[in-house]
A protein has these predicted regions:
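Active-site residues of response regulator receiver
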Residues: 21, 69, 73, 97
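The feature encodes the CheY-like receiver
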Residues: 26-27, 73
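Short hydrophobic/Thr-rich beta-strand motif most characteristic of the beta2 strand and flanking loop
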Residues: 39-49, 57
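Acidic catalytic/metal-coordinating carboxylates
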Residues: 50-53, 76-79
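Active-site beta3 strand of CheY-like receiver
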Residues: 61-67
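Short, flexible helix-to-coil linker/hinge segments that flank and couple to helix-turn-helix
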Residues: 105-109, 120-160
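Conserved small/polar residues in nucleotide/adenosyl-binding loops
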Residues: 163-165
C-alpha cells in the first residue's frame, strides 16, 4: 500500500475521523483507506451505519473530522452535519457521496459541511482532503465545485439581491 503524507508533525496525535454510511462495506473501505494509506497518521474513531449512533459517539469522544454519507435512511447527511456542528466540540464535516442531487452542495454548506469527498476519489485524495480540512481549508472536489456553480447560476437573481453594490 502507498503512503500519503498528511503534512503533520510525527510528534502530533493522529487525526481522528468518524465515518457515517449506511453501507457497512463503505465504512470498512473508508477505515482501510484512512488508516492503511496514511501510515497511522489518521485513526478512525468510529464507523457507524446510521447518523444517530455517530452523533452519540461524536458527543462523547469528538473526532477531528466526520465523513458523512449524504443519502441515508432516517437522518441524512445534511441533518447529521447540522447536528454534529451543534456539538460543544464540533468536528469538521466532509460529505461523503457518490451522487449529488440538485442543491446538495448548497444545502450541505448551509448545514456546516466544509467540503465533499467522493467515494470514488483516489485514497491519497481522500487522505489529503481530511488532513487539509483540519488545517481550515474547505475541500471541494471538481464535481461538487461544478454543482455549486450550477446551483448558484440557477439562483442568480436571488443571490444578486444579497449583494449591495
Amino acid at each position: 500500500m502507498g503512503w500519503v503524507s498528511t503534512e503533520r508533525n510525527h510528534d502530533e496525535q493522529p487525526i481522528t475521523v468518524g465515518v457515517i454510511d449506511d453501507d457497512p462495506m463503505i465504512c470498512q473501505m473508508m477505515r482501510l483507506i484512512l488508516e492503511d494509506y496514511s501510515s497511522g497518521r489518521i485513526s478512525v474513531a468510529f464507523a457507524c451505519t446510521n447518523a444517530a449512533d455517530a452523533i452519540e459517539h461524536a458527543s462523547h469522544n469528538p473526532p477531528d473530522v466526520v465523513l458523512a454519507d449524504i443519502a441515508m435512511p432516517g437522518m441524512d447527511g445534511i441533518e447529521s452535519t447540522r447536528q454534529l456542528r451543534m456539538l460543544p466540540d464540533p468536528p469538521h464535516v466532509l460529505i461523503l457521496t457518490s451522487l449529488s442531487p440538485n442543491n446538495t452542495v448548497e444545502r450541505a454548506i448551509e448545514a456546516g459541511a466544509e467540503g465533499f469527498v467522493s467515494k470514488t476519489d483516489a485514497p491519497e485524495d481522500i487522505i489529503r482532503r481530511v488532513a487539509d480540512v483540519c488545517e481550515g481549508e474547505p475541500q471541494f472536489n471538481p464535481a461538487s465545485q461544478r454543482q455549486l456553480i450550477g446551483d448558484l447560476h440557477q439562483h442568480q437573481p436571488q443571490s444578486l439581491s444579497l449583494i449591495h453594490i
